[in-house]
Every structure is written in structure tokens, then in C-alpha cells.
Amino acid sequence: MTSGCASFGRGIAEAYFEKQQAADTRLCEVTGKAFEGIEPHLDNPQGKMKILMVHGVGDHLPGYSTQFLEKLAKSLDLTVRATRNKEIALRDPLDPSKKLGNLRIHRLLNKSRDKELLFYELTWSEITAKQKAILSYDNSGEYSFRRAEVNDLLKKFSNDTGPDPIIYLGDSRENILISFVQSFCWMINGQWDEIPDQQTKACTFDDLSAVERLRSDQFAFISHSLGSRITIDGLQRLARFFSDKHFRPELNRPKELVEALQQKQIPIYMMSNQLPMLQLGRQLPEITGRNVDYCDPEGSHYPDRILSKTSIIAFSDPNDLLSYAIPQGFVEKYLDSRLCAEVTNININVAKIFDAFGLGKLANPLEAHIGYDTDKRVVALIAKGIGNDHTSGMIQKRCSWTETID
């Protein structure tokens, strides 16, 4: 009798979970203008495609992007890679004693070697590690054993991720932004054979050979959570650096480099976008609400822009408690007009939604926050975009697109 009841119960459970996993109907809604993705820029005989990845909250070690990079490489058919990566310990050119994290560079190519991707992975956790150590006692056995197991896991997650946005609002923000600017500097200073390896070194913008690389190479940023704020703030810091000779006046900024940067269109792929939340309590950028003046070729300040266009592709899972879409008007009011930003919002369920035994639908909020970089649809959108002739078949089948026009 007991055995029969157990079998009956097991059968009900198996049928329930099979129903949950039968079909993947998770949300994928794209609202905005078409975007190309990475793929078309690999076919660039004059230069290289270069991507910088910036992580978000939580302690990260070099190599954190490995799984995402492998999926991206597969989607782009880049089956050849350098035997070893290159590593640079980042420093501030005005204060070499500052430890600004690690930059790891990967080189990937296709089988015929005529397409190449240089992937730069920034790890800035070193900057905040000392301050976050204040909470390390709370993860020790002295305190953690008193918690229920699941609550202990949640508390450790909170201790790991919660402090970073708070720390970023303090003095460490300056060093994190210098770390971003240093990473961008290394992106435009040299191809693979010229990149230093296993060195502690600062980068400067005074090498005129970087001007031609900036003109011929293609660039993109990929970020997660707080990394999106860091990327935008880093670009706004570049805008200030190139426009204000009194800001860090000891460093050169050749006008040829500024002019080359003004011709670039750079996309930012933001996973678990947090720009609206991280704008709370902050001062507005130096120049806002003047996109027409700075971005229209007929605008009065068009020669003073920092980029020709910044395409923001913002991924957000509605069940991610720490992610937000970018609402209409946010760009004009809260982003520096000199970036000439435009936004495409992507609402996408990266966490599966379950029927919680009739109590309502449920998605794991932790999975919804950290699952973007392993989701095949996210990778396919970054690799091949939408609204073009090379869009992935999976995206055409599983994502809807509402195009917006000016």
C-alpha cells in the first residue's frame, strides 16, 4: 500500500514538472530601433572588432566572462583562439600606487583567420574588496550557523552584492571610473602583438598611432547591473576629459584623437540594466536635454559631441528585482547629451516561470538577475542583433520586435 502511494505521488510530481518544462514560451519583447549586433563588424579588413566587458555587483575574479564568451564565440563561429590570454594590472598614470583591477584580453578568430575579435574583460572588484571586508565576519560560522540554510545563502548573496552600489557612491567611484578609462585606453592603443602581457602598467592617450586604430577599429561595451552605470559614467568622464583641459591637466589629449572619437558609433549591451535606480540621489551630468544641439549635424554644438551615436541595448527580466527598463525621456534628462544616446529596451525572461502548485506563478529572482549572460537569446541578440538580414533564426522565431521611429 505504501509503495503504491509513493509511486502515485511520484507520478503526479513527474507529470507536473514535465508540464512546466514542455515548451519554452518565455517572454522576449524588443522595443526600439534595429541594431546590427557584433557579427557584421567582424568583417573589417582595415581594423579589428573590440569588446569591453564590465561586471556589476559582487566579487568577481578574472575569467568571470568565460561562459558568456564561449557562447558568443560559438554564435559568431569564432572557432580559433590564442593559446593564452594577456593580462594587465591597471594603474592610474597620475598615481601608479593605485591598484585599479585587472584587464584580461582574449583573441578569437574564425577558421579562415579573416575575422578577428579582441575581447577585453575588466575586473574592478579589487578596488572595493578592502571596504567590503568589513562585513566578512557576518559570513563566518560564528553567525551563519544561526540562520536557516536558505536564509544564510540569501544573506551571503546580500553581503556580496549589496555594498557595491553604496561604495560606488563614495570615494571608490573615482578609482572605478579611472579603471574603465584605462581599459578603453588599452583598447585603442595597440593590436594583439602590441598589447603588454603580465605587466603592471598605466595607459595614456598621447600616442598618435592610436588615432588611426580608433578610426579603423570597431568597439562595443557589454555590462551587467552596476557595470552599466560604470560604463555610462566612464564615457561621461571621457567627455569631460577630452573637453576640459583643466581636468587632469597633466595628461595629453590630442585633438586628432578627439576628432576620431567623434566619428564613432559605439553600442552598449546592458544586462540587468540599473541606470534608473542608480540615478537616484545623483547630480545631473554637465550637459543634458540638448541632444539636438549636439547630435544633429546642423546643431549649434555638433563639433563638441563626444560620440556620433551611443546605442544602448538594455536587457531587463521583469522578474529581476534589481533591473529596470529605460523609460521614455530618461536619455534626454539624465544622460550627457554629448553621448548622442538612443535606447532599445528588451524585456526578456531569463528565469523560467513556474506554477507554484496553484499558489501563483513564480520565477527565481536570483536566476532572473544573474542569468542573462548564459541565455541563448541574449547572446544571439548581442551577436547578430535584430531587424537585419543576419538576425538569428531563433530570435526571429522566439522574440517579437516593435520598431520605433523618430
Regions of interest found by a model, annotated:
Residues T2-G4:
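C-terminal motif of bacterial Sec signal peptides marking the signal peptidase cleavage site
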Residues A6-E14, I51-K74, E174, I178-K309, ...:
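Serine-dependent carboxylesterase/thioesterase catalytic core
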Residues S7-G32, G47, V54-P62, N110-R213:
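Active-site catalytic motif of lipid deacylating hydrolases and related acyltransferases
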Residues A13, G56-G58, S112, E121-T128, ...:
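Lipolytic serine-hydrolase domain surface
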Residues K33-E39:
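A short loop-to-beta-strand scaffold at the N-terminal edge of the catalytic core in hydrolase folds
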Residues D43-F145, G234, L238-F242:
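Short, surface-exposed "cap/lid" segments of acyl-processing enzymes
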Residues V80, W192-P196, H390, M394:
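Residue-level signal for secondary-structure boundary elements
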